[in-house]
């Protein structure tokens, strides 16, 4: 989407942003929200894909990752964090929605499943890369900040609930290419 007449904006109190930046010691790394949580198993890219993505990005540059999963998705969070070779991440599953919003707001980008975090990051005016595995494009049609990645061989107009696309049809390398393109 080049221009969206209904583009929304999400504003976060400056004091809350300052507090989170202080907690992170004003970390100047490129901050990516890893949206590993989702509404169900058919919409998830998979913990091993996310861990591989993080480890590959760590070889390429200076990054910091916020791993976003719901409180009932700690297993996914642990599967990812246990495989990360560098200690440059923060898990957010123990935070309330109110408390985690500033972390999303200070991020530079969202990469992950179609979930609430992608909406917050895009509404903060940041790029939001979303994997459409089992969700219609309408979920991301409302913002110019969305970039959608589809499983190889799929038509965006034919993906909907019940598509159940194989998450491995989205390669880690293709995601890195999109990140690099949008980052610069």
Question: Model regions: which residues?
Answer:
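Donor-binding and catalytic core of enzymes assembling or modifying cell-surface/extracellular glycoconjugates
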Residues: 47-133
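Nucleotide-sugar donor-binding patch of glycosyltransferase catalytic domains
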Residues: 122-183
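Mid-sequence helix-capping/hinge segment at a functional interface
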Residues: 1-43
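Electropositive phosphate-/nucleotide-binding environments in soluble metabolic enzymes
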Residues: 14, 30, 47, 169-173
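Pocket-edge positions in alpha/beta enzyme catalytic cores
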Residues: 12, 42, 92, 164-167
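Surface-exposed, flexible loop/turn segments at secondary-structure boundaries
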Residues: 40, 73-74, 97, 136-137, ...
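A short acidic, often aromatic-flanked loop/helix-cap motif at beta-alpha or helix-coil junctions
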Residues: 14, 96-100, 153-159
């Amino acid at each position: 989407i080049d221009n969206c007449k209904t583009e929304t904006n999400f504003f976060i109190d400056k004091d809350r942003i300052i507090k989170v930046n202080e907690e992170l010691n004003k970390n100047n790394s490129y901050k990516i929200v890893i949206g590993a949580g989702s509404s169900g198993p058919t919409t998830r890219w998979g913990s091993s894909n996310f861990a591989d993505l993080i480890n590959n990005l760590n070889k390429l540059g200076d990054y910091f990752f916020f791993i976003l999963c719901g409180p009932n998705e700690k297993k996914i969070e642990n599967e990812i964090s246990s495989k990360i070779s560098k200690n440059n991440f923060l898990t957010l599953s123990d935070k309330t929605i109110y408390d985690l919003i500033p972390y999303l707001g200070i991020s530079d980008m969202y990469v992950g499943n179609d979930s609430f975090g992608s909406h917050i990051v895009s509404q903060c005016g940041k790029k939001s890369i979303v994997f459409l595995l089992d969700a219609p494009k309408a979920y991301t049609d409302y913002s110019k900040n969305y970039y959608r990645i589809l499983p190889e061989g799929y038509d965006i107009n034919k993906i909907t609930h019940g598509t159940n696309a194989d998450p491995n049809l989205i390669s880690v390398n293709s995601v890195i290419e999109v990140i690099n393109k949008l980052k610069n």
